[in-house]
Amino acid sequence: MSRFSSLLALVMVAVLAGCGRPEFSDAEKQTIASLALSRLPPLKPDTTNRFADVPAAAALGSTLFFDTGMSGGGTVSCSTCHKIDRQFQDDLPQAVGVGRTNRRTMPLAGVAHDPWFFWDGRRDSLWAQALTPLENPLEQAGNRAAFTHYIKARFGERYERIFGPLPDLSGVPANASPLGTDAERAAWNAMPGAQAEEVNRVFANIGKAIAAFERSIAPPQTRFDRFALDLAAGAEPKGDAAFSSEEILGLKLFIGKANCVTCHNGPRFTDVSFHNTVVPPV
């Protein structure tokens, strides 16, 4: 064999050796383990909602979540945008309810672990978040007086078993809200204060029931989680848990030089904080 051929053979051996399956350092393994869903802590008690972990409240909340009657026109429900087979989002660039909004639908899987809600964090409790789309004219386009009447007519017994007696609604307008149309606001402003407070209480309880249901929506295990569990156990990942060399290199970048893990960390791949990424709004 010529000297050139020998040198070429050595180069090829070195190249092939470099193309082997990448390995993780102990530090990388620790970081990967911290991202596994198995590290997700138990839900903290919701001190703003004493019905948060009441099964009957969650069951009523589930019914309301999927009920198109919980909208002004009877055509849209929470599940219109939060689809059960898409981690409770809809894959659209902008949510479409009664109209088209200017924001993407947020996934609800694991949402109860968040300290604040909406893309801009404008709600600090899950039940307050659940109420907002109900009266948004582009989402469900309803109003709290109409929802209160609807609850009494359709779910009165279930509601009262959980939250206690419903108020007398005989003098409550069919449509009224402090956030609605001009006519709805006028009707709301004409209501006695005590009557408005009773409607607000029922409306708040609607949100608390929906929030109780949403607390039950856990993020599903993914093939990454299975990979991380096998890696932590020292086992060779099998089946869909087996990552390709390209996926492993991508993961090494994610937790290493690319610094993705700086913000996308923890079992839900988020630090639940706000960051200015200098990306213009859609």
Q: Each PLM stretch: what is its role?
A:
Residues 2-5, 18-282:
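Periplasmic c-type cytochrome electron-transfer domains
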